[in-house]
């Protein structure tokens, strides 16, 4: 990727094509790799395959295979299932390439924010060096990271120019996608909004009057959670941690586990 971007930097005259070329490069990498990791194969692609077979966005809400986190959002699996429908068959390679196209909006935001081809190339090399295979191996974590950074950039621009309707619309769209990638997206968005308000107390009233519109991405998240609640689809990790019968006792057991605290103390001692 470093050599590819270096070649682009010195050979491409039209700078607007650079984000698209990065997508093309990552697309080739995605096509050349098979989903073998658990989360990619047994959660995200499994959900997409069920949508492909059942012809329904709600296929996972029958709570079959509870270990596959059936409460997870369906936006990216839906796109993978749509790609499979486009070619007319399912395999473990082509559908996951749809995730790569999801990276284009953050890249365009990064490029417009940096306003310099060399800086964009430098940023892309650093970002993809850190994220590595998480971008194209079927995981959602790399994509979630890119959308978190791009949403942070848009919110920063919104803080500087809260009256710009284009930036506000883009912030809403970014936020809706952020909460629809993984469950963590909702908490990330909440942290970003709270941080925006805390770091701009002098503009608190002006920003707060505009931020009410950010209820839209929370509605996206809430609607999906209501569907999960209606079909009695729970998060197995949350259920195991908090429990249904006696959550206080389960939390006490976790904090009373001496071996965990002993392991932590050994780490600090070493």
Where are these regions (language model features)?
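Multi-pass, polyprenyl lipid-linked donor-dependent membrane glycosyltransferases
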Residues: 95-102, 118-155
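Transmembrane-helix motifs of polytopic, lipid-linked glycan transferases
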Residues: 4-7, 94-119
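Membrane-interface transmembrane helices that cradle and orient dolichyl/undecaprenyl
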Residues: 151-167
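Loop-to-helix entry region of an early transmembrane alpha helix in multi-pass inner-membrane enzymes
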Residues: 70, 74-77, 86-105
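Extracytoplasmic catalytic/substrate-binding loops of multi-pass membrane glycan-assembly enzymes
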Residues: 33-47, 53-79, 90, 235-240
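Membrane-embedded, hydrophobic transmembrane alpha-helices
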Residues: 1-13
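Membrane-interface alpha helices of multi-pass inner-membrane proteins
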Residues: 133, 167-183, 189-194
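Membrane-lumen/periplasm interface segments of specific transmembrane helices
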Residues: 33, 80, 190, 198-199, ...
């Amino acid at each position: 990727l470093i050599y590819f971007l270096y070649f682009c930097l010195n050979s491409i005259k039209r700078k607007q094509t650079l984000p698209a070329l990065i997508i093309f490069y990552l697309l080739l990498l995605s096509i050349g790799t098979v989903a073998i990791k658990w989360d990619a194969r047994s959660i995200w692609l499994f959900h997409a395959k069920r949508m492909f077979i059942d012809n329904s966005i709600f296929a996972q809400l029958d709570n079959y295979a509870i270990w596959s986190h059936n409460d997870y959002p369906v936006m990216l699996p839906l796109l993978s299932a749509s790609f499979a429908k486009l070619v007319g068959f399912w395999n473990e390679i082509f559908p996951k390439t749809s995730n790569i196209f999801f990276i284009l909006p953050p890249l365009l935001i990064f490029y417009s924010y940096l306003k310099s081809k060399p800086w964009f190339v430098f940023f892309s090399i650093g970002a993809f060096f850190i994220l590595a295979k998480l971008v194209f191996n079927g995981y959602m974590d790399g994509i979630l990271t890119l959308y978190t950074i791009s949403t942070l950039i848009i919110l920063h621009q919104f803080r500087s120019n809260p009256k710009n309707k284009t930036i506000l619309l883009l912030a809403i769209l970014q936020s809706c996608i952020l909460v629809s990638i993984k469950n963590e997206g909702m908490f990330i968005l909440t942290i970003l909004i709270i941080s925006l308000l805390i770091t701009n107390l002098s503009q608190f009233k002006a920003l707060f009057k505009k931020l009410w519109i950010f209820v839209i991405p929370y509605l996206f998240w809430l609607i999906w959670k209501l569907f999960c609640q209606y079909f009695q689809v729970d998060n197995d990790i949350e259920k195991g941690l908090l429990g249904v019968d006696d959550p206080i006792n389960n939390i006490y057991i976790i904090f009373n586990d001496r071996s965990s605290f002993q392991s932590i103390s050994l780490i600090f001692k070493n």
